[in-house]
Design a protein with these regions (language model features):
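Flexible inter-repeat linkers and adjacent short helices
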Residues: 1-102, 274, 278, 304-314, ...
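Alpha-solenoid helical repeat architecture
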Residues: 11-15, 51-56, 90-97, 130-137, ...
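Tandem amphipathic alpha-helical repeat scaffolds
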Residues: 19-30, 60-71, 96-110, 137-150, ...
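TPR-repeat structural position
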Residues: 32, 73, 112, 132, ...
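Amphipathic alpha-helical segments of tetratricopeptide repeats
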Residues: 40-47, 80-88, 120-131, 160-171, ...
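Long, mid-chain structured domain cores
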Residues: 54, 62-161, 165
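Loop-centered beta-sheet repeat module
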Residues: 156, 160-226
Length: 369
């Protein structure tokens, strides 16, 4: 399984086609060292296929996927531009990878409606892919998407399907550990703390065994998030500060650490972390986290309720577009409390009602269809 030729190669380009296929197998298996070596070989030969648009598109798709595996936090709005410069592929294999990877890109930069549509288009072509492991990879990434949009149960279900397939194949232990890590996140969202910790520990054991620091830090970040969601701020900060020292462009970890410092009353530390995170998000044009950082900055600076309201409402219009009702509920509830403390009861009442409506929508969205 997994060794088939994914696209029909033009005569004379069999060697490059095989190299590209092998490269994808290493990328998909998260074997970073092997993937890097193959990329160097491919890059030295790629100039010889300038006339073959299909192979060049395939290379551009895999190069995006490779960059994502190496450093998904550097993925920016323009990271898919090289792929988009090609005509829409008619070949089923290429069309599948185009839609699948476009879904990964859109989800990473916070364009969740585009991601949803792209994953749906890819799923229609999944039957054209005679490779069970590719189906597992697809389920894993769709599970990650469901987690990103606060659908914890759907995420748990999809990632468990992926894990089951990966676990049946030798050489895919890293993928199983990635599934364990993501199931841990889904359990965190579902407030199943013990189960979350169990899955994170399994993932950590595997990543320590292969001594891949990037993967170890990913789990440490998620443990930090798990402690943060239980309001165990000092413990969360301990994990997250290590991640942020070693991965200074990790805007997600910067955001959570800043929020925990704010909860602890460390406002100047939080302010510095917010400034760093905001700057990283400007660089990669991540709209979602720009809104999160702006709102957190207003909360941390103890803005008057009306100034906070302007910042929250800017974010809410984006969150509505992307159907991220969980965030609307969280931020409007904070805003309602701010108005209540200032004795502005009409505004407070309005936002308490509005956040309760957002809460209902979040629960509806969470339900398994």
């Amino acid at each position: 399984m997994g060794e088939y030729i994914m696209i029909v190669s033009t005569k004379g380009n069999n060697e490059i086609t095989k190299l590209l296929n092998d490269w994808y197998l290493e990328i998909r298996s998260r074997r970073i060292g092997n993937a890097h070596q193959l990329k160097e070989i491919i890059d030295s030969k790629i100039h010889s296929i300038e006339e073959d648009q299909n192979l060049l598109l395939y290379y551009s798709l895999l190069d995006f996927r490779y960059q994502f595996v190496i450093d998904n936090l550097s993925v920016s709005k323009s990271s898919f531009d090289k792929v988009e410069a090609f005509d829409m592929p008619t070949d089923n294999f290429l069309a599948y990878y185009y839609h699948f990877f476009k879904g990964i890109h859109a989800s990473t930069i916070g364009e969740y409606q585009i991601a949803k549509e792209s994953y749906e288009n890819a799923e229609k072509l999944l039957d054209c892919i005679p490779d069970e492991l590719e189906k597992a990879e697809f389920y894993y990434k769709v599970g990650a998407f469901h987690y990103d949009i606060y659908q914890g149960l759907l995420s748990y279900k999809k990632v468990s399907e992926a894990r089951e397939i990966f676990a049946q194949h030798a050489g895919y232990e890293i993928n199983v550990a990635f599934c364990d890590n993501l199931i841990g996140l889904a359990c965190t969202h579902l407030r199943e703390w013990e189960l979350a910790e169990e899955y994170f520990t399994k993932a950590m054991d595997m990543f320590q065994k292969i001594d891949e620091e990037q993967f170890i830090l990913m789990v440490r970040q998620n443990l930090g998030l798990m402690y943060a969601t239980q309001n165990l701020s000092p413990l969360a900060i301990r994990y997250l500060s290590e991640v942020n020292q070693k991965m200074p462009n990790n805007y997600k970890a910067l955001f959570i650490e800043a929020r925990e410092h704010m909860k602890e009353g460390n406002h100047s530390v939080a302010k510095d972390l917010i400034a760093k995170g905001y700057s990283v998000c400007e660089e990669v044009e991540n709209i979602e986290y720009l809104h999160h950082f702006k709102i957190l900055d207003a909360m941390n600076g103890d803005f008057p309720a009306e100034a906070l309201e302007r910042t929250v409402l800017e974010g809410v219009s984006y969150f509505k577009e992307q159907e991220l009702f969980e965030y609307i509920k969280e931020y409007e509830e904070y805003l309602a409390t701010a108005f209540y403390k200032e004795n502005k009861h009409v505004k407070a009442s309005h936002y308490f009602y509005s956040c309760s409506q957002a809460g209902k929508k979040a629960i509806e969205k969470e339900a398994l269809k």
